[in-house]
Structure formats: C-alpha cells, structure tokens
Amino acid sequence: MQIFVKTLTGKTITLEVEPSDTIENVKAKIQDKEGIPPDQQRLIFAGKQLEDGRTLSDYNIQKESTLHLVLRLRGGMQIFVKTLTGKTITLEVEPSDTIENVKAKIQDKEGIPPDQQRLIFAGKQLEDGRTLSDYNIQKESTLHLVLRLRGGMQIFVKTLTGKTITLEVEPSDTIENVKAKIQDKEGIPPDQQRLIFAGKQLEDGRTLSDYNIQKESTLHLVLRLRGGMQIFVKTLTGKTITLEVEPSDTIENVKAKIQDKEGIPPDQQRLIFAGKQLEDGRTLSDYNIQKESTLHLVLRLRGGMQIFVKTLTGKTITLEVEPSDTIENVKAKIQDKEGIPPDQQRLIFAGKQLEDGRTLSDYNIQKESTLHLVLRLRGGMQIFVKTLTGKTITLEVEPSDTIENVKAKIQDKEGIPPDQQRLIFAGKQLEDGRTLSDYNIQKESTLHLVLRLRGGMQIFVKTLTGKTITLEVEPSDTIENVKAKIQDKEGIPPDQQRLIFAGKQLEDGRTLSDYNIQKESTLHLVLRLRGGMQIFVKTLTGKTITLEVEPSDTIENVKAKIQDKEGIPPDQQRLIFAGKQLEDGRTLSDYNIQKESTLHLVLRLRGGMQIFVKTLTGKTITLEVEPSDTIENVKAKIQDKEGIPPDQQRLIFAGKQLEDGRTLSDYNIQKESTLHLVLRLRGGV
C-alpha cells in the first residue's frame, strides 16, 4: 500500500509499504529517499511517537495514512534527575526524547524499572508518551524522581448518578492528579470536580496518603454547578441569614459559613430542611436544596438528657448524654461506668446496630430511650456471601450473630428481604435461630445466598425409555430432595439416579435454583450402569493412578476421586486427554474416554495468575491463566471473552510476537504482565 510522510518544511514523501513493515523499515525507506539517518528521524501518527520495533498495523496505519516526520536535534543537552534520597543523576537527552526514553536511560544508569519511576517537573507528573519539549524541559532542567510504591493501587470514584469509576493511583498522587485521571476517563474538567472522602472535601495540593485513602477506598464525586446560589437560614428567634452557596457545598461547609456570619460553633448547630436533620458529609444537592430554599437552624441544648442502656444480663445503666453525642462518646461513658472496652461493645436501637461516627440525633434517640448493649466476642470477623450472579458481599459479623442477624445485614447491603434469602454453608441450609458458631462458620468463610422464589412449581423428569414424570417442587429443593421424590414415584434408589439439565450432571447438595431450573423445566434421568470401568491417570512424575469410574462421571467427579487417592485439591488439577484440557462439567463419555484410557494430570501452580491484554483501541482484558498455558490457550480465552478468532490474533510481549506452541513461562510472562493484542489484517490493504 502507499502511505505519505510529511516533513516540517511541508514536503510530502510517498512510500510503498506493507502493514507488516516495522517503523524501523519505514525509516530505512525514508533514508533511501531523503538521505536522513534513521537515528535523526521521529515519526508521529495520531499524535503518538512511533516505536522502531512496532509495525504499521500495530498502530492501525492504513493505506494513504499520513505520518509526520520530525528531525531530532543534533547535539542534545544535559538534564538532571534528583531522587528522594538527594542523589542527582545527569542524563544526555534531546528535546524530542519521550518521557519513556528518559525512564529507559534512568534504568540504564540506576537499574530502576520504568514502571516504578514517576518523573515530576514543575509540580506535574510527566506522561510516558509526551516529549521533553512538550513540557518545555530545557538544558540543565532538574526533574524529580519518585518511586512508585510497587504496583500502585485501585480506588473507586462514585458519582451522584450512582456510576462507579475505577482509577489506578498511588498513595503519593495529589488530588489534582486524581482529577486529571477522572477528566481522562469521563471528560469532566477538574475545576468542575469536587471530591469527598469520609465527609471531607479534598484539596488539590494534598495527596491521597495525606487523607489516609487506601486501596479500594471509595471517593464521592460532586459536580460544581457553575455560578452558585443564595439560600436562607432561619433561626428560632426569627432572624433570617442569607448565604452564598453552591449545590455541591456540604452541610459542614454551610455550618462554617454560618459560624463566619453569626459566631455559632458548628457543633452547636443543627440544620433542618423539609423536616429532616441534615448530615455534615452530605451536600445541598443531595437534599435537593435549591436557590432561595430556607433551612431552619436549631441550637443544640447544652443541658442534655438521660438515656438507658440495657445489658444482656438484664442490668440497666443510666447515662447523661446530649443528642449531639456520637455513639463513640456513649461507649466511652459506658466504659467509665462499667469498665467494658468500647471495642467490645455493640449498641442496638430499634433493631439496628449503631455506628461509632454517628450521633444519637442521627438515630432519633431521644430522652429516656433504651439502647441494648451486646458484647462482642473479641474482635468480630469478616465473612463472605456469594450470590448466584457471582457477586461477593463482605459482612462484618461475630460468631454469636444469628442467621437472622446475618440476613438483616444482607438486607441492609443489598435490599433483599430476609424471607426471600436462603443461606447455604457446607451444603447445608442455615436456620434463622442458630448462630454462626453453631455451624462452625469461621472468619473468611463463604456462605452461598439463594433467593426463594415465592411458592412451588412443577417440573418434568424424562427417562431414557421416554416416560415423563411430573414432580411438585420448590426452587429451594436440593437435587437430593428431587431424587427422593423420584424414588417415591418410581422406586429407583437415589444412588442409581443421575439427573441432567442443560447438558450438566446435577450435584446432590445444590438446589434447583442454583441451576436456574424453573417451572416446567425438563430434567433427564439416566440410570447409573452398575459395574463401571477402569481408567488410568498419569502424573508428570510418571506415577500412574488407577480409578474406578463410569462413563457418566463428570470430570469434577474424577478430580474428586484423584483427591481421595492422592490428596491433590481439584482446583490444582488439570486433566488432559488426546491433547485437550477437560472441563469440569463434561462427562467421560462426552470425551469418548473408554475403559483403560489414560488421562494426563498436570498440576496448576497454586491458584494461577492474572494477566492483562491490551488492544489497540486501548481496551484492557483481564485473563485467568497459568504459567503452563500455551499461547494457543491464551488466544482461546481471548476468543471466549471477545469473540476474536485465534487466527486473527497476534500477541506481542516485550516487543516480541508470541508463538502458539510456546507457554507463558517460556516467555517469562508473570502475574499482572500486559500483552498487546494486534489483529491480523486479512490479506493486504
């Protein structure tokens, strides 16, 4: 195909190229035509400097595209790089060098990998693809080198519309940097962004670590409406104060403005709008407070009130408090009276556990209200609840919590009424009145949440003879229950029944709703053949294991038998037959595995690893892989996720195209490495 190269003088050169030509090849063609040495050429396309080792198709350069040629200045210049230890490094550079090039030079001198380097000039973090001249970095300028804490971290930014944005950041990033990243993702100018964390508005010049923002923290993004507005604040004496505000101001900001005008400390102010007490961390727009709205200001009484605290032993304690006291303050008063450390206290009011940072008035606790005090078994713990959609919820619980309490916490988080929740642990449905410790549920255990569909339903079971049986069931029935119903109707013992739905063999401990079996679904009943057959499993050490199996056994069943014999957990086993990796849900007969066949057992390196695949559109795909996966396997996983046939995929790592038959470990591709995916153009262009 033909492409054009435009020089700074305005001259246009025409070149004959192919999509597979490297940038290096193109520079050689320019040298042939114009006599300019490749090392003095910089080629730019779509605003990006092109790298020698990449191809035209990598950059999606098509026929009749125009590249721009910039000449490198001869001679270059010196710049200095100062590290946090105070050491200064001198580098030979050119104005046209990219920040990436500069980091490579620092790596040559100091051995610091580029991905751990952050370069700062004039208070700004420098981006890899930009050049020194883009930032007006001149000879003898000094850059500052900050090391990235390994790998950075992810934080979330939640907008008022409920959308959540994920950002890659570092503790040392300033709020200004974070706003710039949000602008890159969402297009919102930084001057219209207000970021809130823990009820505080974040200041541009401070860093995430200044605010103790850690990995997976959630910031709230509020948009500044241009212009602001006036609101009125009416006191109990009848006086009205006028304030200049913005919809994005927090209640805390408003109280500060009232203090400026009237001298009333914020902690003595309670603001009421539409009958509701306003919380410090929320904004005016959260409460739909618009221009010329009127808030009511009530002063907190200094005198306070009495409340009662009832313990599980039946003892009642009387406390002197104020509506503005936090739950933390109340716990401290209980400690003074009873000697119970606050971290062992849980306070309950109106069936809700009270949070330390909230006040009594937040919970509408009034004089002579009674709180209930429950003691924490030291420390509490976290457990996980996995839903059928695959979502995992984290709960703070204690061994003494009842299943009922746990369902209430799930309702708080997810809005699912307790009477629609069924919790399963170790294959057992959990009963409301029992505690977590009754079921030996320990920290970081995972419960499974199944939703009860209201009422029962009919399903059909079809036998191999063609007979159809009708059963009355509920979505919450286990497969074991269903087999018992079949035994009642047909006299077939459960251990001779195999039930199949949507091509999958159903497991006894799972429920119909686990498999999305709905009313009038049809299951297939297959009788287990008595007798079975033997197969062999060969390990990488050369050891051969003999197993008694049936053609109808699933690969999952086979892995369980291997675990029984050899102690290898199923999630570390990969079984290979006829060169194919076998999938858990399929049966031996699906793969035509017959008596005395030999399977090969490969151990997964514990847990596998994640890698990233970046496309030319900038999209990043995350894959679960193992070092022993071949490039062919990886392409198949990409096809599963993205629908791109393997024969149209080219994978690049460290500038090298990866070959199908080699493994990830052959190329030293480790966890969280990034591969680049280039699509093969069919034919020429």
Curated annotation (Swiss-Prot):
Positions bearing the Glycyl lysine isopeptide (Lys-Gly) (interchain with G-Cter in ubiquitin) cross-link: K6, K11, K27, K29, K33, K48, K63
Record flagged with keyword Oxidoreductase: no
Site (Essential for function): H68
Any Pfam family matching the protein: ubiquitin
Keyword presence, Endoplasmic reticulum: no
Propeptide: 685
Gene Ontology molecular function: protein tag activity; RNA binding; ubiquitin protein ligase binding
Effect of G75 to R/Q: No effect on ubiquitination by CRL2(KLHDC3) E3 ligase complex. Impairs ubiquitination by CRL2(KLHDC10) E3 ligase complex
Reported impact of G76D: Impairs ubiquitination by CRL2(KLHDC3) and CRL2(KLHDC10) E3 ligase complex
Effect of S65A: Prevents phosphorylation in case of mitophagy. Decreased localization of PRKN to mitochondria
Cross-link Glycyl lysine isopeptide (Gly-Lys) (interchain with K-? in acceptor proteins) placement: G76
GO biological process terms held by the UniProt record: modification-dependent protein catabolic process; protein ubiquitination
Residues annotated with Phosphoserine modification: S65
Effect in UniProt of substituting R54D: Decreases affinity for UBE2R2 in CRL2(FEM1C)-UBE2R2 complex
Site (Interacts with activating enzyme): R54, R72
GO cellular component: cytoplasm; cytosol; endocytic vesicle membrane; endoplasmic reticulum membrane; endosome membrane; extracellular exosome; extracellular space; mitochondrial outer membrane
Domain Ubiquitin-like span(s) in chain numbering: 1-76, 77-152, 153-228, 229-304, 305-380, 381-456, 457-532, 533-608, 609-684
Disulfide-linked positions: none
Modified residues ((Microbial infection) ADP-ribosylthreonine): T66
Keywords attached to this entry: ADP-ribosylation, Cytoplasm, Isopeptide bond, Membrane, Mitochondrion, Mitochondrion outer membrane, Nucleus, Phosphoprotein, Repeat, Ubl conjugation
Record InterPro entries: Ubiquitin-like_dom, Ubiquitin-like_domsf, Ubiquitin_CS, Ubiquitin_dom, Ubiquitin_ubiquitin-like
Positions bearing ADP-ribosylglycine: G76
Further information: Ubiquitin is encoded by 4 different genes. UBA52 and RPS27A genes code for a single copy of ubiquitin fused to the ribosomal proteins eL40 and eS31, respectively. UBB and UBC genes code for a polyubiquitin precursor with exact head to tail repeats, the number of repeats differ between species and strains. For the sake of clarity sequence features are annotated only for the first chain, and are not repeated for each of the following chains.
Protein family (similarity comment): Belongs to the ubiquitin family.
Name of the protein in question: Polyubiquitin-C
Gene field: UBC
